[in-house]
A protein has these predicted regions:
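Buried, small/hydrophobic-residue-enriched core segments of structured protein domains
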Residues: 2-69, 148, 156, 160
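Short, flexible micro-motifs
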Residues: 112, 181, 212
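Conserved small/polar residues in nucleotide/adenosyl-binding loops
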Residues: 206-213
Length: 217
């Protein structure tokens, strides 16, 4: 995938995971074998296995493979693989601007920004969406017309916690059921998997001077 860093330099990054998934999604036999693995029950079972102490051995291997500096986090040893992915970063590594007129970033990731209008589309991991097709709520989609969609894509090396972007109150939350394809965009080059994936979002009413937001998709 291509990225642009903060200095405007273009970075092309292809991982071993990208290569493996491209093989899986471009061959009929492997796609058929993969179907049972996409079921929510299988995903839940995998989650339980990655909560075991035995799975903790993969945390250090993963950190080294992806150049993750564990000294930036509050602890360097983990009880499980999932414990590693929910690790908490040291406060000084993510200073927060608390001015009422500022929206902070909700998470680490690669950022794209799109205007929201009636016939407009924006892209999430190579998949085109309208506001309505993403959140499946026509009334709420109309509310955001004229605004901006800020899409932040986390990759495996990013910090996997997120926060609200300003002070306020969560007023609405919705889960859209679906299946559990990989979130790697390589797979989406073969078929539009993200429109089939389960997802969840919430609406936040802010008490600061910042605009209201749709969060967590």
């Amino acid at each position: 995938m291509d990225y642009m860093d903060r200095e405007g330099h273009r970075i092309k990054k292809t991982t071993s995971q990208d290569k493996f998934l491209k093989f899986v999604y471009t061959h009929t036999a492997t796609r058929v074998l993969m179907r049972p693995l996409l079921l929510p029950a299988v995903s839940r079972l995998g989650g339980k296995l990655l909560n075991t102490k035995v799975s903790a051995v993969f945390a250090g291997l993963f950190a080294r493979a992806h150049g993750i500096d564990l000294n930036k986090y509050e602890k360097q040893k983990f009880d499980s693989y999932n414990d590693f992915f929910t690790r908490k970063i040291k406060a000084e590594e993510r200073p927060v601007n608390r001015e009422d007129t500022v929206l902070i970033s909700p998470c680490d990731g690669k950022v794209s920004v799109y205007p929201i209008h009636e016939n407009g589309r924006f892209f999430i991991k190579h998949t085109p969406y309208t506001t309505h097709s993403l959140i499946r709520d026509a009334k709420l989609a109309r509310h955001y017309m004229g605004g901006w969609a800020v899409v932040i894509r986390l990759t495996v090396d990013d910090y996997h916690r997120y926060c609200y972007v300003a002070d306020g109150e969560k007023t609405y939350q919705r889960r859209i059921p679906g299946i559990f394809h990989t979130v790697n965009p390589i797979a989406n080059d073969i078929c539009p998997i993200y429109k089939m994936n389960s997802r969840e979002y919430c609406c936040l009413l802010y008490t600061s001077d910042a605009a209201d937001e749709l969060d967590g998709v």
